[in-house]
């Protein structure tokens, strides 16, 4: 199970960001592995994504470890259900930025909306890295890489906004992100949760480190 833990720091994002990276061992255990750390430009929190095999252990981390190490003002958790990871096209542009796309939909149409996201034909300058159900403030969360916000908006307007059941789509720029899981583990993790990978023979799982605002181009 994947869980996003949103951490709202008291002492500023920069200090808390560094504290997370310096204390990853204290923020994890045998059942809860930190995968990725990210920060959305418009928000006053950062997000630490975990792979969780025991939800009770994550509860201990959230109520014990995170407060003792990071001293946040508050935390919020979002469970990512049925996550799907996408490989990246080989002919992608180099200067990509990462955006979180949050979709609110009608309950009876969510499966069709989710499948629409999975099976769209994506161009090389707008494509997802993951999609999952979240069922919180939003119903579906996906991360996309693109050359600009305008390009993401244009693509979603043409290909998703008119989908039956879509109520709202919000786009947020991810200005900072870092993979904290070991590279080989993260690659295996993504591949094991990529049921679509056989449809993308021209894609790969290698991502350049030069992507602006999208370090390692993951999640």
Residue ranges and their predicted role:
Residues 1-219:
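A compositional/biophysical signature of low hydrophobicity enriched in polar/charged and small residues
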């Amino acid at each position: 199970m994947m869980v996003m833990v949103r951490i709202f720091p008291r002492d500023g994002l920069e200090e808390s960001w560094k504290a997370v990276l310096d204390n990853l061992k204290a923020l994890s255990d045998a059942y809860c592995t930190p995968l990725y750390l990210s920060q959305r430009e418009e928000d006053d929190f950062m997000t630490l994504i975990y792979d969780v095999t025991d939800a009770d252990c994550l509860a201990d981390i959230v109520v014990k470890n995170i407060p003792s190490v990071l001293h946040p003002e508050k935390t919020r958790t979002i469970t990512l259900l049925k996550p799907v990871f996408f490989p990246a096209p080989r002919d992608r542009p180099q200067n990509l930025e990462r955006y979180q796309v949050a979709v609110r939909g009608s309950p009876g149409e969510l499966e069709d909306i989710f499948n629409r996201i999975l099976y769209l034909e994506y161009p090389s300058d707008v494509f997802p890295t993951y999609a999952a159900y979240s069922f919180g403030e939003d119903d579906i969360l996906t991360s996309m890489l693109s050359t600009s916000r305008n390009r993401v908006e244009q693509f979603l307007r043409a290909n998703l906004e008119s989908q039956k059941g879509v109520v709202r789509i919000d786009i947020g720029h991810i200005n900072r992100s870092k993979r904290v899981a070991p590279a080989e583990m993260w690659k295996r993790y993504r591949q094991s949760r990529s049921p679509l990978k056989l449809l993308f023979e021209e894609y790969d799982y290698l991502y350049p480190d030069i992507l602006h605002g999208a370090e390692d181009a993951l999640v």
